[in-house]
Swiss-Prot record:
Pfam families according to UniProt: Plug, PT, TonB_dep_Rec_b-barrel
InterPro entries documented for this protein: Plug_dom (IPR012910), Plug_dom_sf (IPR037066), PT (IPR006970), TonB-dep_rcpt-like (IPR039426), TonB-dep_rcpt_b-brl (IPR000531), TonB_rcpt_b-brl_sf (IPR036942), TonB_rcpt_CS (IPR010917)
Record's protein name: Probable hemoglobin and hemoglobin-haptoglobin-binding protein 1
Annotated source species: Haemophilus influenzae (strain ATCC 51907 / DSM 11121 / KW20 / Rd)
GO BP field: siderophore transmembrane transport
Stretches forming Sequence repeats: 26-29, 30-33, 34-37, 38-41, 42-45, 46-49, 50-53
Statement: the UniProt record of this protein carries the keyword Ribonucleoprotein: no
Length: 1063
């Protein structure tokens, strides 16, 4: 920590606090009840019609949680080590709109950036995503598929929405951020900490009245987002209700230099990793929160809640890397159109009892059913008029004149056939060459008319080349349409070829006549990938609390338990369909013989276009649904106990314990099967005489190719071995010591642990390929964390300064490691390189934090309303391992010069650079106006503190290529050769200034406006920099030059404003 520099502002606040202590009143030495570090979210809302002896306490509680209340002050005696609570009022004042804004002015916590799919959870104390707990109203939120194998295979290609779902900020009453091990509250997953949300309730608004109405409109320029929120709360006799309906409609976040391209055409042509502008997406969120309560008397309450939200992203992956740049452009070959969705629906029923008994003062029983679906749909097709599949240079179009359908060109005339030598060629109505643009494959007997879209009672003008007597015509003829019926009852039309009456050597002659269609297919083939990650959670939960005195000690007891069942599954749906369909593919379809055989009767094929008639290419083809992961049901049984003990006026203890028993029950759904090739042979190989691959089966060998009974038997044997149950048990604890030696100093110590049970994909995922295979591991251990923390808080009235130091130790980190080369088929010499998730690493993070707030009015009465704030987090950490990481051993055999790099402790990319946040603000005594200035200062991420997981394939090295040792030159990154394991992209130091103000001209009206990045600073955050990929097709830049990195920069100067009416 030699580089740490103490803040001048923090020193000033400390000096001011200490200077004022001399004038402070003497301590009362009265014991102060302190809330426990609760293992689960407990309700703070009590019924408003409590017994008389509780009315004052209830009133105080309700005033504290009043969403529209004015107080933002922190009760130092209630603040826990490493814990921050953010109220709804503070979020509204800061104009927070998403998870990024939630932690914008916090230090030591950031969001994980994923590019197209947005933020994915949080990064705290060196770990991120699934290693940081997220809960909403007591329910854990969806986890990502976290296995490194899945990330290597699928995540870098944008085929899955593999993110942690977020919450609508307008629904949040409080957000509690805990840094450090926290399984006590969040259960499995909270190694680095947790973020726990509690949603609003009708009682938060109905303090002194029976109704509340609010309408809020907002707008922010960084993504052109429009906000509309309607809030209704009411109470009638024994019933109360709350409805919050929120709509957000905007587009992608505008990076710095967003308007780099001069026009829309240039914008659409800037494709691939070198694109410097954020990809165009339309992003909407619709959220509805409804809570209905029934309280027949002061001791009983029933309630039901619905929390339903959908986040949808539509747009084009212009930076998508998988396209033939050298020979094509997006205007001819198309782009990747995406439609991602994150849906969350939670229905909750609860019963509360407020009768005081020897066992509880308050008891709550709740049942919740939560369904989360993260969908990623991509359509790869060309959607413009310039696409090859819909090319129509002559502008041919269909018109109806005087009861006759005619095909005319772009000039409004008909094509003409001109005799050129021994042949005829088409000219358009202005005499221009059109022959190369007209299809030769639209004979009358191969084309049927869709009578559902055209009026088949009218005639159609066709082009006749030879009549039924084989005489040349090269002219138009108006024909009647004969109507037929398809098996589904729909009508179609046909125009039969005329046949001659005089037979010839090959039968009766028939005319040669056709439709004059454009030469292209008339549609673009849409390659659709529609993939869902589903999480369905059901929970029954019992919470009890009791306050009592025992001898000379005071106790606040919390205890209870829960049973939770979660089904996690994946559904892949891949199919091809027609997109950008033009009239000649829409109004007509193919008539062809079965198998395309000549001489057989032609029948209608509505799923085949006229252009695809020869090969029988279908417009729509569906291979059905499948999955790469077996569905797994997780059952979790939990018991918890917590007691806050006040031993004396200056000594208190937090004693908290939780027991988790997690069971994984894998299953298999035949409706969405796992492809057999992913499972067959992984445990039980095929026999030497089994032919698994090949065009033929030699004599004496057994046919075990795909879909044979032999293959299916091996698949079933391996599946049975894969479907093994696993379970994990863990004892979590959180022990705290609170010392109050004076009325201006509080000392707190915390010792806590946490665990993360492996996710189902880390245990059960399988994949098989000669270049890269993954085997399951049902013997994985749970990851664990232990946190030690000490905090010193100096305070006076509403001002405080907290200095804390922490250490977090992680064990049994799960990592993908090379296991061995293994034969799948004993009769084959091919060995598959198998990787497996194993417990490898351990890590340690140390750091210090400062949090302070100085109310200037506490020092000088004339400065009443002014306040200063300062926060800082400084942390360092490394991942340690007693043996080489995966793949290093083979690499070092040929490249021993890199031994020192491969053997050193690995930096932790999830650690944020040193961050400070300064706050200067003023609130008028009338509370009618105020403003805040936030200054965020972030240090550069040092090269030695970053890690590039692909470094062994990028440095200059020797490789064994097909048995020959060759030297491979170094990959260039940003114009320089990669020489070590340092991260390729890092942020420089930056300072950002935000200014936010509010104004209440009348009681019911509030205006809020802010300028963000006031100085228009160009900067790249560390979380955006580390999201840039070297492999895959998304979130890429041109590694050699760094072109495309501008796409990842934060927005320049931007503005937000909102207006809220309240009644």
């Amino acid at each position: 920590m030699t580089n740490f520099k103490f803040s001048l502002l923090a020193c000033s606040i400390a000096f001011a606090l200490n200077a004022s202590i001399a004038y402070a009143a003497q301590p009362t030495n009265q014991p102060t009840n302190q809330p426990t570090n609760q293992p689960t979210n407990q309700p703070t809302n009590q019924p408003t019609n409590q017994p008389t002896n509780q009315n004052s306490n209830v009133s105080e509680q309700l005033e504290q949680i009043n969403v529209s209340g004015s107080s933002e002050n922190i009760n130092v005696k209630e603040k826990k080590v490493g814990e921050t609570q953010i109220s709804a009022k503070k979020l509204a004042k800061q104009q927070a709109s998403d998870s990024r804004d939630l932690v914008r002015y916090e230090t030591g916590i950031t969001v994980v950036e994923t590019g197209r799919t947005g933020a994915s959870g949080y990064a705290v104390r060196g770990v991120d995503e699934n290693r940081v707990g997220i809960m909403v109203d007591g329910l854990r939120q969806a986890e990502t598929l976290s296995s490194q194998g899945f990330k290597e295979l699928f995540e870098g290609y944008g085929n899955f929405n593999n993110t942690r779902n977020s919450i609508e900020i307008e629904n949040v009453k409080t957000a509690t951020i805990t840094k450090g091990a926290d399984s006590l509250k969040s259960g499995s997953g909270a190694l680095g900490g947790s973020v726990i949300f509690e949603t609003k309730d009708a009682r938060d608004y109905l303090i002194d009245k029976d109704y509340y109405l609010s309408y809020k409109r907002g707008y922010q320029t960084m993504n052109n987002q429009n906000l509309k929120t309607l809030t209704l709360a009411g109470r009638s006799k024994k019933f109360d209700i709350l409805i919050i309906d929120t709509t957000r409609d905007g587009h992608e976040i505008e990076n710095y230099d967003y308007k780099i391209y001069p026009n829309k055409q240039a914008d659409l042509r800037a494709v691939g990793p070198t694109r410097e502008k954020a990809d165009p997406y339309q992003i909407t969120r619709q959220s509805t929160l409804i809570k209905l309560g029934f309280q027949p008397n002061e001791n009983h309450r029933l309630s039901v809640a619905l929390d339903d939200s959908t986040l949808e992203t539509k747009g084009i992956d212009l930076s998508y890397a998988l396209r033939p740049y050298s020979t094509a452009n997006n205007e001819k070959y198309g782009e990747r159109i995406i439609n991602d969705q994150s849906k969350r629906k939670n229905i909750q029923f609860s019963y509360e009892n407020f009768s005081q008994t020897p066992f509880w003062d308050h008891i709550k029983l709740s049942y919740s059913s939560q369904k989360i679906t993260n969908k990623a749909r991509s359509d790869e097709y060309c959607h413009q008029s310039t696409c090859n599949g819909v090319s129509n240079p002559q502008g041919l179009h269909l018109v109806e004149e005087k009861g006759v359908y005619k095909i005319k060109d772009k000039y409004g005339g008909e094509l003409e056939s001109k005799e050129i030598g021994w042949s005829h060629e088409f000219k358009n109505s202005k005499g221009e060459d059109a022959d190369k643009d007209i299809s030769q494959r639209s004979s009358l007997d191969s084309v049927l008319i869709n009578c559902e879209k055209l009026d088949c009672s009218k005639k159609f003008r066709i082009y006749q080349e030879y009549d039924e007597n084989s005489s040349e015509k090269y002219t138009y003829d108006d024909r009647e349409i004969e109507v037929g019926t398809l098996p589904n009852g729909k009508k179609y039309g046909k125009i039969p070829l005329k046949k001659g009456k005089t037979p010839s050597w090959n039968g009766f002659p028939q005319e040669t006549a056709r439709f004059l269609f454009p030469k292209s297919y008339g549609y673009s083939t849409d390659f659709v990938n529609d993939r869902d990650l589903n999480t369905h959670t059901q929970q029954i939960k019992l919470d009890l609390d009791k306050e009592f005195h025992l001898w000379h000690t005071q106790h606040q007891l919390k205890y209870g338990g829960l049973y939770e069942k979660t089904l996690k599954s994946m559904v892949n749906h891949q199919y091809n369909t027609a997109a950008n369909v033009q009239w000649w593919a829409d109004y007509f379809f193919c008539a062809r013989a079965k198998g395309g055989n000549l001489g057989e009767k032609k029948t209608p094929h509505p799923n085949v276009s006229v252009a695809g008639c020869v090969n029988g290419t279908p417009l729509h083809s569906d291979i059905g649904k499948d999955t790469y992961l077996i569905p797994v049901t997780t059952k979790n049984n939990v018991l918890y106990f917590g007691d806050n003990v006040q031993l004396t006026s200056w000594l208190g203890l937090d004693l908290n314990y939780r027991y988790d028993h997690v069971k994984y029950l894998p299953g298999y759904d035949e409706k969405t099967p796992v492809p057999g090739g992913l499972i067959a042979g992984i445990f039980v190989p095929f026999n030497e005489k089994d032919v698994v691959y090949g065009a033929y089966v030699p004599s004496g060998y057994k046919d075990c190719r795909y879909n044979t009974e032999c293959y299916k038997k091996n698949f079933e044997e391996n599946l049975a071995l894969l479907l093994r149950k696993t379970d994990y048990k863990h004892h979590s604890y959180n022990l705290g010591l609170n010392l109050d030696p004076t009325d201006w100093l509080r000392v707190q110590l915390k010792y806590a642990n946490a665990f993360r049970a492996p996710t189902s994909d880390e245990i059960y995922m399988t994949f098989k390929h000669p270049d890269f295979s993954i085997g399951p591991n049902t013997n994985l251990k749970a990851e664990t964390a232990k946190t030690k923390e000490v905090a010193f808080t100096f305070y006076k009235e509403n001002s405080y300064l907290t200095l804390s130091a922490f250490q977090s130790d992680y064990r049994n980190f799960i990592d993908l490691v090379f296991e061995k080369n293994k034969q799948i088929d004993k009769g084959s010499a091919i060995e598959y390189p198998f990787y497996q998730n194993q417990n490898r690493d351990q890590a340690r993070v140390r750091g210090i934090e400062i949090a302070s707030r100085l109310e200037m009015g506490d020092l000088f009465e004339k400065l009443q309303g002014f306040h200063l704030g300062y926060k800082l987090t400084y942390q360092k950490g490394r991942i340690k391992d007693n043996k080489l990481r995966s793949g290093y051993a083979e690499f070092l055999k040929l490249n021993p010069q890199y031994t020192a790099i491969a053997s050193q402790d690995q930096p932790m990319n999830a650690l944020q650079p040193t961050t400070s946040v300064y706050n200067i603000g003023y609130d008028a005594p009338s509370k009618k106006w105020g403003m805040d200035v936030y200054i965020t200062d972030v240090a550069a991420k040092k090269a030695k503190d970053s890690f590039n997981s692909q470094w062994t394939s990028m440095v200059k090295r020797k490789e064994n290529i097909y048995g020959t040792e060759r030297t491979v030159p170094a990959t260039q990154a940003n114009g320089k050769d990669v020489k070590d394991s340092r991260g390729l992209w890092r942020n420089n130091r930056y300072t950002v200034i935000d200014t936010i103000a509010y104004w209440k001209p009348i009681k019911n009206l509030t205006f809020t406006a802010g300028v963000y990045n006031l100085t228009n600073k160009k900067y790249l955050t560390w979380d955006s920099a580390r999201s840039v990929r070297h492999l895959g097709t998304i979130n890429r830049v041109e590694t050699a030059t760094g072109k495309g990195l501008n796409r990842f920069y934060a927005p320049g100067r931007n503005y937000r404003m909102s207006v809220q009416f309240e009644f």
